[in-house]
Amino acid sequence: MTIKNPLPTLLFFLAPTFLMAQGKGIAPADLLKPLRDSWPTYNGDYTGRRYSALTQVNQSNVQHLTLAWMTRVTPGAGSGGGRGGGGFGGASNIIVGGEGPGDIAVGGGTIKASVLQVDGTLYFTMPDNAWAVDARDGRELWHYFWKTKGGTHIGNRGLAMWNNYLYMETPDNYLVSLDARTGKERWHKVIADLSQGYFSTPAPIVVGNHVLVGTGNDIDAPGFLQSFDPETGELQWKLYTVPMKAGDPGLETWASLDAARHGGGQTWIPGAYDPETKLYIFGTGNPTPAYTTGTRGDGDNLFTCALVAVNVDTGKMAWHFSTSPHDMHDYDSAQTPVLVDAMFNGKMRKLVLTAARNGYYFTLDRVTGERLVSAKYGLTTNWAKGLNKSGAPEHDPGKDATVAGSLVSPNSDGTTNWEPPAFSPDTGFFYVAEGNAYSIFYLTDVDPRGSMGLGGKEEVGVGTAGSYLSAIDYQTGKVAWRRPYYGNGGGGGLLTTAGKLLFAGDGAGNLVAHDSATGKPLWHTRIGGITNAPQTYMLDGRQYLIAATGDTIWAFVMY
């Protein structure tokens, strides 16, 4: 269903159509340009800053933002698929692919994807589904449906683009390439073993002639990052995030090789790329089992819960930094890092910034991995007893899960989670959604099926000290200001612009524009809970602001 608002007082429906997406696509070199009229990759550009140079919408006029259109999509393949027919306003032809039988019914979809905008077309996903819609009015141009073999349908975070080709991952672990103009499939390749519990949720990232692909898993299986040829889909290299053979670096931090080979460290969120060093920097997930040292020992369990830099041409690790050595609370460090070139101690430095799920913030030199700043940003974070000699937090054994229970903050959802942070070069602030919930962690398991790769744990939430939109000074790690989120919890990821604006959701379902220097709210509209982050682009001389909630994309402009 599509609703368009050509004037503030006029709404009308668009009839079903089948159209072709127009345009020349995105050349790999174009991904290196500053972010303005398009949004060609997961975070807009390779830096992860989610900062747009657009200024048409700014502090002086943001209150005039008005709904331009909204479009609601329906996943599945109509009567032949597993999830019902297409919605009003949908394309009349649905392209169907996949290796599954076509009759596996899975849960309804939510748009957790970052939406690409190239040549006036928006591209986005749900699990097993991809769409192209007109960026001017939300009309559906094509819809691709993947017949799944099964797997965990927890979400899909979007597409990558290379020339006129798109790439998506599926819950049953295929990398699928589509023609961006028609939605027709070019090829698909297996990227992980479904029988081993893997499921794939990230958006791929295209870097030159590499399609970088991560995966997820919640049982005792090793994490890895892979690179595929964008033309043929052939595997170029594979980097494991845990030691896999005798002599591998980091093996000494595990109880045994067998423990390391089943040690987790999944790669389920896209990273950031520095074209000058050819380093792709990404975060890794928790070790497994997550809540007990029974098999993994008392070491740091490298390279889980870490920032890792890999050379995209060779697939070799350049450096790593553990943000949660020997994690005991499922504090994945998979959050997208942010790359900035900025002053630090009077010198221009190439930096990487991250606010980890564990409640700690870090600034590192992204060329060498040298740790420059470590600071606690969570108001209630209590699981660590201080910093170790490398500047990483040292876990407090007294906060490990016990039979009697341990009161820990943050809970396993973290002080922040996967939703994207942002950075503004105008303010020097790193922005992040901050939650301060408490749980009691019990070393027990009341579910007879077990608890996946968690190692036996029951978690009981016992309240929160509040959720905030927080601004962190990257040079000190200190929180410059906090704005409370209204409603229940946080509100998705973030967007900053040269119009001195910071866009965010809140826990009450509002999309809010803030003063990026102070956090003061300047405008809001209620659209529901934002599932990824707001985005912006310029088209036909007008700046659009878009956000996804549930199965709907909303677009705003100034009238």
Predicted feature descriptions by range:
Residues 23-78, 114-117, 139:
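Mature N-terminal segment immediately following signal peptide/propeptide cleavage
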Residues 96-111, 121, 457-464:
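Intrinsically disordered, low-complexity acidic Ser/Thr-rich regulatory segments
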Residues 63-74, 130-151, 162, 174-195, ...:
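Extracytoplasmic/lumenal domain signature
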Residues 39-43, 105-128, 151-175, 199-222, ...:
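Repeat-blade elements of multi-bladed beta-propeller folds
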Residues 1-4:
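N-terminal secretory signal peptides that target proteins for export/translocation
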Residues 52-58, 84-91, 446-448:
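Short Gly/aromatic-enriched secondary-structure transition segments
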Residues 8-18:
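Bacterial N-terminal signal peptides
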Residues 78-107:
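Disordered, low-complexity segments in secreted/periplasmic proteins that are enriched in proline
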